[in-house]
Each structure stands twice: as structure tokens, then as C-alpha cells.
């Protein structure tokens, strides 16, 4: 959520941010209505202050007349009328306040200055690592290879839960566990993250705090009677760990990692490639979350991204890092890097991580603050997160990129101690 002072004093900054995202046409009316409501709020406050001053004066005059033994009936009636006007003005002010706050929830974050303008076609490759394997007919797509190896059971996953749900069996289940342990060990032992194990269901306040609600409520799986929601990512519960709390500056940066299942209805995914593990409703992921001092948050983003890249290097998967254009940057993010691996069996680059800086956008919604020094006024932290990494597409890439001429699949050296073997055959 934005600082309401932007709306009051720097509306042009908000308009420019929405323009860079390609959202000005869509959200221009929201800004116009918010500006109108803010003007109405200011008018109500001005009138309210005038009426409060008048009431105070009338109250004093009533006291003086009574003290002098004079009739104050007319003044008392006037005071009551003023009180009714004050009540009405307070209601107008409160209604305008609530409406403006609701509209602020509809506005995405403002992209940082170095984020390129445009849609996804303007995403910029900032670096690459490794050499992607050239697709050829001998490389079996991961869905066929996984089923042939007895690792994936797509049909029974669909029978149990519907399309987009996967059953991992035998070595497939072991591979998921191996990936989890390897990633968590690297992030906790090498990168200094605190491991957390968080609930898979959260309340509305948590989803609102990270920016998932109200904008993307249709994408969430809901437990309606309890008003709880399955998490789309561990970002939601981990970011909300310190909701409505004040940290000391010395505690920053705070670093958390968490493994979790993730649930997404993908309501807007019709027509996209959903074969195999490419687009599913439930998947596993290790998430990194940071609370940072605003002065160092850009450096924190670069560090977090490099830590996600470490996993891809250990898995020996060639990848590229994209700086997302403003129109492709997520709702809450001010700057995002996507990590993509190449899957030669399907001939596509697959996103396996998004590493984002949210500035104080989430912190304002969740009221997460820090105190710069003793006695100073609390300020909002900057939040960051990144997938490190999402398992389903990683498994797809492993099965395709490390596929051998004899049909076996080589297990990367760093993963072998966790998986217990060097080859899948």
C-alpha cells in the first residue's frame, strides 16, 4: 500500500508509476475518484474544525449567561444543532477516509527508476550461466520420462484431485525430499537464514498484508466457513510473522527460509501450457524472505537473487536472469528478477524463481516497522522475497537437461548425498 501522502501531495508520482506499468487507463479512474474523495475529506475536516470552534464558543457563552442568571435557551439549542452537524461531518470524513484507503489497496507498487518500461517483451536478460542443451528429438519430455521411471503418476493425481495435481512416487517422492533438504541446508548453513515451518492456511489479514488480497482473491483456495485460505507461497505467513510489530534497527536484516506446499487456482491460466509439471495447482517450494533497512534493500535484492542462483549452479542447470519490465512486474513489487532454466525436452525457458523488492509496500499493509534508534519514531521496513526454488519446474528441467543417451537421468553431484544415488534409470 502507498503512503497516503502521495495521494494528497504527489498525485503525479502515482500517475507516472501507473503509466509505466501500462495501468493508467485501467486505474486512472481510481486515481480520479481517490483525488475527489481526498478533496471531500479535506473539505469535511475544514468544516468540522470550524464547527468545533463554534461549539466551543457557544459552550463558553452558555456558561457565561448561566453565571449571570440570563436565559441561554437559544444558545443551548444552537449548540445541539452544531453537535448534529459535527456528527454528520465526522461521518463524512470517516467515510471518505475509508473509501480512500480501500482505493489505495487497488493500486500496485511504483516500479523503481531502473525498471524498464513495457510489457513482458521488454524484459531484459541481465546475465546467463551455463550453456542450454539444444533440443532434439532424442530428449524425452519430462512427463513421459517421469512416468517411465515410475516417478510421476499424473493420471492418479488427476483422479484424486483433478487436473493440475501431481502424485510423486518412489524415487520421485525421494527427489522432492532431497531437493528440500539440499536447499534448506544451503540457505541455513551457508547463507545464514533462519529456517521456519509455517502454517499452510492463513487469515485474510495475512493475505492482505502481502498484497494478495483484495486484488487476487479469486486465485486463492478458500476455507469459506472459517475465512481461511491456502497459501500461494510461504511468503505470506513468513512476511506476516512480524505484522503489527516494531523491530529494533539492530535486528535488520532479518532472514527467513521456509519449505511449504503452495496452492494456486491459476484462474487466469486458461490456454497456457499445462502439460506435466509446467503449470500445476499445488507445488512445493523453498522461499526466502528478508526484512531490510530501506538504505540497504537494493543490495539485499542482489544478494538474495545470487543466493537463489547458487541452487541452480549446484543443480548444474543453465539459467538466465531477467529484469522484469514494469508491465510484467508483480502487483506488490517495485523491482523483480526472474530466474529461468531451459527445459530442452519441451524447448522452453521455465521460470523457477522470482526475486523481488517490495520497498515499504507490504510493510505498510502489514504494519511492520523498525525503530532506527532509541527514542526515534518507527519507520516501515523494506521487505523482499524470492523462490529458492520452486520444485515442479526444477524437476522437469532435471529430467530433461540431465537426460543421458541411454535414457537414464544423471543426478547432479551436489544433490547425490541427499538423493542417495548418482543416476535415475
From Swiss-Prot:
GO cellular component terms given for this protein: cytoplasm
Pathway linked to the protein: Aminoacyl-tRNA biosynthesis; selenocysteinyl-tRNA(Sec) biosynthesis; L-seryl-tRNA(Sec) from L-serine and tRNA(Sec): step 1/1
Protein location: Cytoplasm
SUPFAM superfamilies: Class II aaRS and biotin synthetases, tRNA-binding arm
Keyword 4Fe-4S: no
Family: Belongs to the class-II aminoacyl-tRNA synthetase family. Type-1 seryl-tRNA synthetase subfamily.
Stated name of the protein: Serine--tRNA ligase
This protein's encoding gene: serS
Amino acid at each position: 500500500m502507498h503512503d497516503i501522502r502521495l495521494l494528497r501531495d504527489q498525485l503525479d508520482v502515482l500517475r507516472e508509476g501507473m503509466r509505466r506499468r501500462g495501468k493508467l487507463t485501467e486505474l486512472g479512474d481510481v486515481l480520479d475518484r481517490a483525488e475527489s474523495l481526498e478533496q471531500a475529506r479535506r473539505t469535511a475536516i475544514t468544516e468540522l474544525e470550524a464547527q468545533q470552534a463554534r461549539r466551543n464558543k457557544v459552550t463558553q457563552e452558555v456558561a457565561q449567561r448561566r453565571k449571570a442568571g440570563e436565559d441561554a435557551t437559544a444558545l443551548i439549542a444552537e449548540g445541539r444543532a452544531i453537535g448534529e452537524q459535527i456528527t454528520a461531518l465526522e461521518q463524512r470524513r470517516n467515510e471518505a477516509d475509508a473509501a480512500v484507503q480501500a482505493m489505495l489497496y487497488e493500486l500496485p507498487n511504483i516500479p523503481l527508476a531502473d525498471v524498464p518500461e513495457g510489457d513482458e517483451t521488454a524484459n531484459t536478460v541481465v546475465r546467463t550461466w551455463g550453456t542450454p542443451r539444444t533440443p532434439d528429438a532424442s530428449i524425452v519430455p519430462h512427463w513421459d520420462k517421469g512416468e517411465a521411471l515410475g516417478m510421476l503418476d499424473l493420471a492418479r493425481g488427476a483422479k484424486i484431485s483433478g487436473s493440475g495435481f501431481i502424485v510423486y512416487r518412489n524415487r520421485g517422492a525421494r527427489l522432492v525430499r532431497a531437493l528440500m533438504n539440499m536447499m534448506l541446508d544451503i540457505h541455513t548453513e551457508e547463507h545464514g537464514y533462519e529456517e521456519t515451518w509455517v502454517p499452510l492456511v492463513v487469515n485474510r489479514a495475512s493475505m492482505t498484508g502481502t498484497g494478495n488480497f483484495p486484488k487476487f482473491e479469486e486465485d486463492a483456495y478458500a476455507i469459506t466457513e472459517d475465512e481461511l485460505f491456502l497459501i500461494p507461497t510461504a511468503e505470506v505467513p513468513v512476511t506476516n510473522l512480524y505484522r503489527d510489530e516494531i523491530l529494533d534497527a539492530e535486528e535488520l536484516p532479518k532472514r527467513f527460509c521456509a519449505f511449504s506446499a503452495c496452492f494456486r487456482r491459476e484462474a487466469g491460466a486458461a490456454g497456457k501450457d499445462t502439460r506435466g509439471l509446467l503449470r500445476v495447482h499445488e507445488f512445493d517450494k523453498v522461499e526466502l524472505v528478508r526484512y531490510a533497512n530501506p538504505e540497504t534493500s537494493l543490495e539485499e535484492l542482489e544478494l538474495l537473487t545470487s543466493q537463489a542462483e547458487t541452487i541452480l549452479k549446484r543443480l548444474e542447470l543453465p539459467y538466465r536472469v531477467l529484469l522484469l519490465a514494469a508491465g510484467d512486474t508483480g502487483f506488490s513489487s517495485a523491482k523483480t528478477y526472474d530466474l529461468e532454466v531451459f527445459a530442452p525436452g519441451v524447448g522452453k525457458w521455465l521460470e523457477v524463481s522470482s526475486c523481488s523488492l517490495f520497498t515499504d509496500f507490504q510493510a505498510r499493509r502489514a504494519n511492520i516497522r523498525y525503530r532506527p534508534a532509541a527514542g526515534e519514531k518507527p519507520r516501515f521496513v523494506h521487505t523482499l522475497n524470492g523462490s529458492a526454488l520452486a520444485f515442479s519446474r526444477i524437476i522437469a528441467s532435471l529430467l530433461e537437461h540431465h537426460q543421458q543417451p541411454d535414457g537414464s537421468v544423471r543426478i547432479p553431484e551436489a544433490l547425490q548425498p541427499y538423493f542417495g544415488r548418482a543416476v535415475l534409470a
